[in-house]
């Protein structure tokens, strides 16, 4: 089987990416009590209003996708299903370290409990789902996998560009499944927006890098022990 792999899913020409976010999804379920609104005095507990208070308590000028960059993580509420009896808020949590994820998830829990405290009789339950982890944790143990990619970029006449991915790739999961998988550029821009586009010239250059990468593995690996590489 393969000893390593490379995804071709990056942006600017020359990029070699070995570090990604660590990512969790978190669901906060707010529980209220529904009854006939005409006779609800002193009885109804509206879970929608509890959730609204929770969202109001979330940070606005920090820890959000629109206020963070570089090595900063964030908390992002992205969808909700609302009803008087139950309202769920789905969030994604991103950081480059596992402790950073835990700090942000503890913040979400505390703010949700603060919102519940404003509405006697309501309660909140929490569910955390692991999505992927920072592939750097694995790739640091196999430095030649990324170094060969850097050399392939240089052989193609490009400068190597490296910075953490503020997102994830298939390599984020593959690396933790035992297949160290850095990411190589493909000329993609404006990811996940209505204005997403890809450069044909950069795609051609990415192919050249892949060919050089295959040659480097051939050169550096003793005959009889050559790994089977994959390009995803």
Question: What are the functions of these language-model segments?
Answer:
Residues 47-232:
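Metal-dependent amide/peptide-bond hydrolase catalytic core
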Residues 1-47:
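Fold-level recognition of mixed alpha/beta catalytic cores in primary-metabolism enzymes, strongest
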């Amino acid at each position: 089987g393969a000893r390593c792999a490379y995804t071709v899913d990056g942006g600017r020409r020359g990029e070699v990416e070995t570090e990604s976010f660590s990512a969790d999804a978190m669901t906060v379920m707010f529980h209220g009590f529904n009854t006939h609104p005409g006779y609800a005095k002193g009885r109804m507990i509206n879970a929608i209003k509890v959730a609204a208070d929770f969202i109001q308590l979330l940070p606005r000028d920090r820890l959000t996708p629109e206020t963070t960059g570089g090595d900063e993580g964030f908390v992002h509420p992205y969808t909700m299903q609302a009803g008087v009896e139950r309202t769920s808020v789905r969030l994604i949590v991103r950081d480059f370290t596992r402790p950073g994820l835990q700090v942000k998830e503890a913040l979400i829990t505390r703010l949700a409990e603060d919102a519940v405290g404003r509405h006697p009789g309501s309660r909140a339950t929490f569910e955390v789902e692991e999505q992927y982890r920072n592939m750097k944790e694995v790739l640091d143990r196999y430095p030649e996998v990324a170094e060969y990619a850097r050399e392939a970029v240089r052989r193609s006449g490009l400068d190597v560009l490296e910075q953490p991915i503020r997102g994830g790739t298939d390599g984020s999961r593959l690396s933790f499944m035992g297949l160290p998988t850095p990411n190589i550029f493909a000329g993609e821009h404006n990811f996940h927006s209505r204005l997403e586009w890809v450069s044909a010239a950069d795609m051609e250059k990415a192919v050249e890098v892949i060919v050089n990468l295959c040659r480097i593995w051939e050169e550096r690996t003793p005959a009889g022990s050559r790994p089977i590489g994959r390009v995803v």
